[in-house]
Regions:
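Accessory RNA 3′-end/elbow-binding domains used by RNA modification enzymes
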Residues: 1-9, 13, 17-34, 38, ...
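Catalytic cores of RNA-modifying enzymes
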Residues: 1-167, 174-206
């Protein structure tokens, strides 16, 4: 049984759910989920949680993501990227100097309004479905944070490369449109690649072709591409549970007078097997989530 995290280097034109469907077929495992949607035009790091590890998707500690994006000046589209319909074109009257001048304004906590072409739901309906019907609705701005933004040059005229490290829920398309507006320009996103997602980086990622080749080579080759679910929680302190405490965790029973500081822990048993997460409050140890699958 496949249990773990496969980090995929998502290709262009695939949706994040397309990737999950592919992995379900490869693993013959229905419990597959991804951590952080990438638009079809985007490429890069997409962590896919498989088997029992799928329970960790909503428990990730680090939601920070890093993107390499291209801003194209002189046009604006309905989707905020070059896959959309061009709404307006305009002469480009600003460049690198103006871009560098406005970038510091976008650092730090801020409110961002999700674009109409997004998976955000209004009354149970995804915004992108409404947008495809020509319907525009009011959206509430949401808190995000831009932790770092760096200029990476201009590979072609009127296009600028930016590397952005940001919080969960940040729409890079919207950020680039806002940056262009601050420059007094129209702008859209011409390319996007995610280089990190939480603790996972491009170095962890595998192409779908590599996944298929591993499947063809056999179960051991496929398992070798998986990262353990414990990798999600590596920043938490480690607690090693003795057999009595391990049994308490399995049974959902608290352990009183536990000799450790209050806090959240990742837990292994005496044999080094990762069991799950636990919390200690006032000397009482309680299980939060188990990931070990017992036969």
């Amino acid at each position: 049984m496949a249990n773990g995290i496969i980090v995929i280097d998502k290709p262009q034109e695939w949706t994040s759910m397309d990737v999950c469907a592919k992995i379900r077929g490869v693993l013959h495992e229905r419990r597959v989920g991804h951590a952080g949607t990438l638009d079809p035009m985007a490429t890069g790091v997409l962590p896919v949680f498989c088997g029992g590890a799928s329970k960790a998707v909503d428990l990730q500690l680090d939601h920070t993501k890093t993107y390499c994006a291209r801003l194209r000046l002189g046009m604006q589209t309905d989707t905020g990227d070059i896959t959309g319909t061009v709404l307006e074109t305009a002469p480009v009257t600003a460049g690198e100097k103006e871009l560098l001048a406005v970038l510091p304004r976008f650092l730090g906590p801020q409110m961002q309004t999700p674009p109409m072409y997004s998976a955000v739901k209004i009354n149970g309906q995804p915004l992108y479905k409404l947008a495809r019907e020509g319907v525009t609705v009011e959206r509430k701005a949401r808190p995000i944070e831009i932790l770092d933004i760096r200029y990476g040059g201009s590979p072609v005229e009127n296009e600028y490369v930016l590397t952005v490290r940001c919080s969960k829920g940040t729409y890079i398309r919207t950020l680039l449109e806002d940056i262009a507006a601050a420059m007094g320009q129209k702008g859209t996103m011409s390319a996007l690649r995610r280089t990190t997602a939480g603790v996972y980086t491009e170095a962890d990622a595998h192409t779908l072709e590599e996944i298929q080749a591993a499947k063809d080579a056999g179960p051991e080759a496929l398992q070798a591409l998986m990262l353990p679910v414990e990798s999600v929680f590596e920043s938490l302190p480690l607690l090693v549970a003795e057999p009595r405490v391990e049994q308490h965790l399995y049974n959902g029973c608290p352990t009183s007078r536990y000799p450790a500081a209050d806090g959240r822990y990742r837990v292994r048993n005496a044999e080094g097997q990762f069991l799950g997460l636990a919390n200690i409050t006032g000397g009482v140890l309680k299980v939060e989530k188990l990931f070990v699958e017992r036969n």
